[in-house]
Every structure is written in C-alpha cells, then in structure tokens.
C-alpha cells in the first residue's frame, strides 16, 4: 500500500510575486535563504542540487540526485548556500527572511530535553503543535522529525488531523515511529507496499475517524484519540530509543479556536501527557494556552512549557479545490501506485448479504439536545449499520481489525487493516465490486463508511 503524505509546504515569505518557470533554470541560493515553489496538480518538476547543501523540511538533499515533485507546495532551504537545477513548470520565488533560526533553536532545546531524559531514564518530550489552518504545523512536524532522525533519534509522530493523512488515507488518525529519513518526494514517505521502495517504508498504526472535523462528532473523536494515545504511549514504553526521543503530535487547525476546540486540545494534552506545546502563528491562541496550561502539570508532575513560534511567510492558503485534488491523488496512489511504483489492486465481487457495513454518524452530540429534560441516550452509538446502496459507489471503506460479531465500542477501538474502494454496485444482482490492496477476505470484517474522504472520482475510468 503506497500511501504518500500530502506534501504541503511551509516557510517564509518575501514580497516578490511568484514567477512562472517553464524550462531548465539554475538558481543560486545564498546562505540562510529559501526557494519556494508550487507545482500544479497533474504537473511535475525535477530538482537537482548541483553544489552546496540544501534540505526540505529538515531532510538533506543529496548532491547530483534528481528529485521529482508532483502537485505540491513546498520549499528548499539552505544554511550555507547552494546551486539548484530546476526542470519543469512551477510558480517559484526565493525568500531571504525565514523563521528557520527559531525552528532550529526549538530542535536543539528538544535535544537537550532528550539527553536529560536518557540520563534520568525518563520519557523524552511529548511535543504538541497547535495553530490555525495554513500556519505550517505539519511542515514544522516534518522538520522536527527529520532533525531528530538525523541525530540518531526515533521520534513517534502522531497525526490527529483527519482532513489530511499521514502515511494513510485522509479520515484516519495515525502514529508511526520514524527510524529512517523522510521521503521528501512523498511528503511523509510511504507505508509498506507490494512493490519495492527506494526509501525505507514506515509502519503506521492507523485508527479510523471518518469525518473531516473533530467537531463533527466529538463523542467519536475523543475515544479514537484516547485509543491512539494508548497505543503510542505503549510503544514509547516498549522502545528505549523512542522513549528518550518522545513524540511529535500534529493537530487540525480547526481546534485552535473556540471553547470546543480548546477542550479538544486539553483532551489531547491529557491523553498524550504532553509537556511541550508549540503555538504557531496566533498570539490569541498562545494567550489561551497560557491561561489553561501555565500552572498545569502532567500525571508525572511535569510542568507544561509553551513556546510561541512565528508562522513562516511561505505558508500559503490551500483552497478546497486543491485539497480535494490532493485527496483524490492520495487515494489513487494507495491503490494504483505512482510514477515510481505501479501497484495492481485485487478486484473481488461480494454479495450484499456477506457485508457488515457501519456508517459513521455525524454531529452525534447534537442529537441528545432534543431529548426531554436534557436527557441523553442510554447507550449512545457512533455507527449505524446500513445495507449496501448505490450511494456507496466510488466510496472508501475502512476494513477493521475486528470481528463482525464485536460491539461497536470494540470496532471503534480497533486499528485499520486497510481500505477498499467501491468500484461498482449492482442492485439487481445484489453484488458489489471492490478494490483491495491485497487478495484477502473482507466479508468477515466490519467495514466502516465515513463521509471523509468524500467519494473520489471514478478510479476505474
């Protein structure tokens, strides 16, 4: 299963407007400058470092190696200056003002905490990154992860943003231990596939939420986060190198505003025993976090440190159309691979009565508001069991590590085996054709149908 990250970009700005590049160009970058580029969906560029040193979100680029980037917004930074060869069409410009000094200082501060943790036999820093949408949270998470790996560390990286996938399809929450370099061409890299990979693959633990925003169903989001935290914390305790390195936790921008969002941040802080909070691009959020956590301590008695970091000027707004195209590209690559690896999904036809499909409920917290006297449901459920219908065409189902006989709570807490795509629904014959990464039975597993990612285009066309 090839599951690239979404490759979104961060990093600082300059007032100059981007210029279109259509052919081979040579760029001479001065020390402490950044080359920012945007590649349209369906297009690609090739970049080669001819001399000097350069990196993408902390991962160093090899000299004279050609890197290919498809449909992304990204940046290349150089500490000492470099010479780049760029081949292909993109929007690009060079910025000299960047927040990299503050970011690298943050990395060194975390390294000191990791060294202290190793000496004391304690847990390393559990870092939570918060901030509004499009402030570079994921890019900072990549950068801190890459720098930690370059120091010989093995951070556990956690994604709690269901709108974008980390080593998985959007709609899921994941955690993975990073022991090797991040694949700069694929964002976070890829998980294990049936084909070869030039960069060591990652092995994520995946849980399915299935909605775009935590606020769409808080009563489902919170227990899924709790289960993810339990799994990540257990891994931390079982691996000495991971334990001293700690965690890096990415969050959705939507929870960085309003009381409901702040309560979700508090839940994440509590479940992951967070002791470092990095606030990106919002003084108001930083003030609120100080009010909530300046006197707060973890269960181990550790104080919570808050650090406000500037948003990079290179952060750009990614409109809904761009993000939808990215999700569709991610799903297509999951089943069919990319330009480097061609994958062949297995096709199987299953009868309607063989499937156990559960639909994720939305806005469940609102339903009890209409009960008399403010009463709540005795046993609220997060899923609704549904029969196959034509509306499932082109949708994605999560195949759970559970039995069809299990309770809904057990199914919710189970990890994801993989995903299947509904290629055809035949109501007359009561059959459904699905695509799966591997030739495996899905009829003995519960399938979860969420509204996120939304139904993509016809992958078979």
Swiss-Prot record:
<feature type="binding site">
    <location>
        <position position="34"/>
    </location>
    <ligand>
        <name>ATP</name>
    </ligand>
</feature>
<dbReference type="InterPro" id="IPR032324">
    <property type="entry name" value="Clp1_N"/>
</dbReference>
<dbReference type="Pfam" id="PF16575">
    <property type="entry name" value="CLP1_P"/>
</dbReference>
<dbReference type="InterPro" id="IPR028606">
    <property type="entry name" value="Clp1"/>
</dbReference>
<protein>
    <recommendedName>
        <fullName>mRNA cleavage and polyadenylation factor clp1</fullName>
    </recommendedName>
</protein>
<keyword id="KW-0507">mRNA processing</keyword>
<dbReference type="Pfam" id="PF16573">
    <property type="entry name" value="CLP1_N"/>
</dbReference>
<dbReference type="GO" id="GO:0006388">
    <property type="term" value="P:tRNA splicing, via endonucleolytic cleavage and ligation"/>
</dbReference>
<dbReference type="InterPro" id="IPR027417">
    <property type="entry name" value="P-loop_NTPase"/>
</dbReference>
<dbReference type="InterPro" id="IPR045116">
    <property type="entry name" value="Clp1/Grc3"/>
</dbReference>
<dbReference type="InterPro" id="IPR010655">
    <property type="entry name" value="Clp1_C"/>
</dbReference>
<dbReference type="InterPro" id="IPR038239">
    <property type="entry name" value="Clp1_N_sf"/>
</dbReference>
<dbReference type="GO" id="GO:0005524">
    <property type="term" value="F:ATP binding"/>
</dbReference>
<feature type="binding site">
    <location>
        <begin position="134"/>
        <end position="139"/>
    </location>
    <ligand>
        <name>ATP</name>
    </ligand>
</feature>
<dbReference type="InterPro" id="IPR032319">
    <property type="entry name" value="CLP1_P"/>
</dbReference>
<dbReference type="GO" id="GO:0031124">
    <property type="term" value="P:mRNA 3'-end processing"/>
</dbReference>
<comment type="subunit">
    <text>Component of a pre-mRNA cleavage factor complex. Interacts directly with PCF11.</text>
</comment>
<keyword id="KW-0067">ATP-binding</keyword>
<dbReference type="InterPro" id="IPR038238">
    <property type="entry name" value="Clp1_C_sf"/>
</dbReference>
<comment type="function">
    <text>Required for endonucleolytic cleavage during polyadenylation-dependent pre-mRNA 3'-end formation.</text>
</comment>
<dbReference type="GO" id="GO:0051731">
    <property type="term" value="F:polynucleotide 5'-hydroxyl-kinase activity"/>
</dbReference>
<feature type="binding site">
    <location>
        <position position="73"/>
    </location>
    <ligand>
        <name>ATP</name>
    </ligand>
</feature>
<dbReference type="GO" id="GO:0005849">
    <property type="term" value="C:mRNA cleavage factor complex"/>
</dbReference>
<keyword id="KW-0547">Nucleotide-binding</keyword>
<keyword id="KW-0539">Nucleus</keyword>
<comment type="similarity">
    <text>Belongs to the Clp1 family. Clp1 subfamily.</text>
</comment>
<dbReference type="Pfam" id="PF06807">
    <property type="entry name" value="Clp1"/>
</dbReference>
């Amino acid at each position: 299963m090839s599951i690239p990250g979404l490759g979104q970009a961060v990093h600082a700005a300059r007032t100059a407007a981007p210029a279109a590049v259509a052919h081979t160009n040579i760029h001479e970058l001065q020390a402490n400058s950044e080359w920012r580029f945007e590649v349209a969906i369906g297009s690609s560029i090739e970049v080669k470092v001819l001399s000097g040193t350069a990196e993408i979100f902390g991962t160093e680029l090899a000299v004279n190696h050609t890197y290919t980037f498809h449909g992304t917004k990204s940046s290349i930074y150089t500490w000492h200056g470099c010479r780049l060869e760029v081949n292909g069409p993109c929007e690009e410009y060079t910025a000299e003002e960047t927040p990299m000094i503050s970011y690298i200082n943050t990395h060194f501060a975390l390294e000191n905490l990791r060294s202290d943790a190793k000496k004391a036999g304690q847990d390393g820093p559990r870092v939570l990154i918060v901030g509004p949408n499009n402030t570079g949270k994921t890019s900072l998470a990549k950068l801190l992860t890459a720098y930690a790996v370059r120091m010989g560390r093995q951070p556990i990286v956690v994604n709690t943003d269901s709108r974008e996938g980390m080593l998985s399809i959007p709609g899921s929450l994941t955690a993975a231990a990073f022991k090797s370099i991040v694949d700069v061409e694929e964002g976070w890299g890829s998980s294990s596939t049936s084909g070869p990979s030039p960069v060591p693959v990652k092995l994520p633990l995946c849980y399915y939420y299935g909605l775009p925003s935590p606020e769409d169903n808080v009563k489902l989001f919170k227990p899924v986060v709790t289960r993810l935290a339990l799994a990540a914390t257990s891994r931390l305790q079982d691996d000495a190198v991971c334990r001293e390195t700690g965690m890096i936790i990415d969050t959705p921008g939507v929870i960085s505003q309003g009381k409901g969002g702040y309560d979700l941040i508090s839940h994440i802080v509590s479940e992951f025993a967070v002791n470092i909070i990095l606030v990106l691009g919002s003084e108001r959020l930083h003030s609120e976090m100080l009010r909530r956590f300046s006197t707060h301590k973890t269960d181990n008695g550790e104080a919570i440190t808050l650090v406000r970091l500037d948003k990079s000027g290179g952060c750009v707004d990614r409109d809904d159309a761009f993000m939808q195209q990215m999700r569709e590209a991610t799903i297509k690559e999951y089943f069919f691979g990319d330009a480097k690896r061609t994958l062949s999904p297995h096709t199987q036809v299953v009868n309607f009565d063989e499937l156990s499909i559960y639909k994720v409920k939305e806005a469940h917290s609102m339903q009890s508001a209409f009960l008399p006297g403010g009463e709540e449901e005795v046993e609220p459920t997060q899923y609704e069991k549904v029969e196959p219908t034509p509306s499932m065409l082109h949708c994605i189902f999560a195949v759970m590590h559970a039995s069809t006989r299990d309770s809904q709570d057990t199914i919710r807490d189970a990890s994801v085996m993989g995903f299947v795509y509904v290629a055809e629904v035949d109501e007359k014959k009561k059959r459904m054709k699905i695509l799966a990464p591997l030739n495996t039975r899905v009829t003995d597993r519960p399938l979860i149908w969420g509204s996120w990612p939304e139904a993509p285009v016809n992958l078979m066309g």
